[in-house]
Amino acid sequence: MKSSLIKNTVNKKVKFKKGDLVQILSGSDKKKTGEIIAIIHKTSKVIVKGINLKVEASKDLSKKVETGEITKFEAPIHSSNVMLFSQKNNISSRF
C-alpha cells in the first residue's frame, strides 16, 4: 500500500484534563462554561457537562406497547472549540 494512501493515525495531544472548567467558543452554546467529563483522544474531542445536549428517542422493542423514552445526552465537541476558563479571574485563555 502506498504511503500516501495510509491515513495518518497519530493522535493529537489534547491540552485539557478531565475536570477542567472550559468555555465554549463556537456553536449554539457559545460563551457557556462547563466541566469536562470525558476526553476522546482518537478524535480530539471532549464531552462537557450540560453543554451540547442532544435528544434521542428510543422504543422498547421487547414489549409490544409502543411507548418510548426520550433521553438527553452530551455530544462531543472538538477540542479547538473550547478554551480553559478561570473562575478566579473570570477570563478564558488558550494556555
From Swiss-Prot:
Keyword Amino-acid biosynthesis among record annotations: no
Against CDD domains, the record matches this protein to:
KOW_RPL26
Kindly name one Pfam family recorded for this protein.
ribosomal_L24
Primary localization class, coarse: plastid
> Keywords on this record?
Chloroplast, Plastid, Ribonucleoprotein, Ribosomal protein, RNA-binding, rRNA-binding
One cellular component term from this protein's GO annotations in UniProt: ribonucleoprotein complex
Gene Ontology process terms (BP): translation
The subcellular location is: Plastid, Chloroplast
Write out the GO MF terms: rRNA binding; structural constituent of ribosome
| InterPro entries associated with the record | KOW, Rib_uL2_dom2, Ribosomal_uL24, Ribosomal_uL24_CS, Ribosomal_uL24_KOW, Translation_prot_SH3-like_sf
This molecule's function is given as: One of two assembly initiator proteins, it binds directly to the 5'-end of the 23S rRNA, where it nucleates assembly of the 50S subunit.
Q: According to its UniProt record, which protein family does this protein belong to?
A: Belongs to the universal ribosomal protein uL24 family.
Oligomeric form and interacting partners: Part of the 50S ribosomal subunit.
The name this protein carries in UniProt is Large ribosomal subunit protein uL24c
